[in-house]
Amino acid sequence: RADQRSLVLRCKTGISRIELDQLLYCEVLGRTLLFHLSDGGVLESTGSMDELARQLAPYEIFLRPHRSFLVNMEYVQNISSRSVTLTNLVQIPIPHGKSSDIRRQYLEYAFRRKQVML
C-alpha cells in the first residue's frame, strides 16, 4: 500500500524491508540492533539506538522507555512503574523515576489515535 510506512535494514542475510506496523520493538546489544517482529521473527542489523530513534521519531508511534529499547505503542498492553508489557507479554524495563514520563507519552499517543480512555 502506498500509505504503508516501512524501514529498510541492512542485515546479515541481505537488505530487508519491514513494515513499521509489524515491528513490536527494537533492542540494542552493543552495536547490534535486534528488530522483533509481530510474527515472532527477529532481524539483526548494526547501528545505534539513538540514530534509529531519530529516524523513527516523525512517525510518532514509538516510545523509548529505556536507552536500550524502542517500543511500538500499538503493541503496548500495560505500563507499570517498572516496565512496559507488550501484547506478546515481553516486559521492557523502565528506569526508576521515568514511569510518569513514559505514561504521559503513551497517553498523548492514545489521544492522537482517538483511543477510548476509561
Go through each PLM region and give its residues.
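Inter-domain helical "communication" segments and dimerization helices
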Residues: 1-5, 107-108, 112-118
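Conserved binding/recognition cores within well-folded domains
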Residues: 1-87, 93
